[in-house]
From Swiss-Prot:
Gene: mntP
Ranges that cross the membrane: 3-23, 41-61, 69-89, 105-125, 133-153, 168-188
Protein name per Swiss-Prot or TrEMBL: Putative manganese efflux pump MntP
Membrane topology annotation: Multi-pass membrane protein
Coarse class of the protein's main subcellular location: membrane
Organism: Pseudomonas syringae pv. syringae (strain B728a)
Amino acid sequence: MNPISLLFLALAMSTDAFAAALGKGASLHKPRFLEALRTGLIFGAIETITPVIGWGIGQVAARFAESWDHWIAFTLLLVLGLHMIYNGIKHDDDEEQEKPGQHSFWILAVTAFATSIDALAVGVGLAFVDVNIVVAALAIGLATTVMVTIGVMLGRVLGTMVGKRAEIIGGIVLIVVGATILYEHLSAAQ
């Protein structure tokens, strides 16, 4: 996977967490930078671990599917991208119902894990392409940390305007990354 695709993948993986962070920030009276950074670090750590776990699962499966691995990666990213777009379109006000006191470590960790399920599946897909999983996981984790920190700070102002649109954009980016992987493999085979 080339560096540009990796960058787009990392940003795409962070958009659902960014959308959740907007909601978290919107529910705080005055988000402080340390609270935003703490939230970003929790989300980023979980988003770093989940693709590695998925990659490990994918490594076991990769031995059985080497001839069609690029189709697996494309299909996973396509399905995840479409799922993110669907979630961005459907009406869901759960984030707005949370109260400011619910920003405990465990609430943030559970929210972070819920938004990182797609990173777990992407990790499975990454097992089928030529990528350094440590670099990919760190890129995803760093992008998530930065995006969530910014999301919490922007949440109070932009939470209701941008929240779900970020997830739609992330879904589109995932589909483009998947199509790029498929194109690279098919053009290399010619």
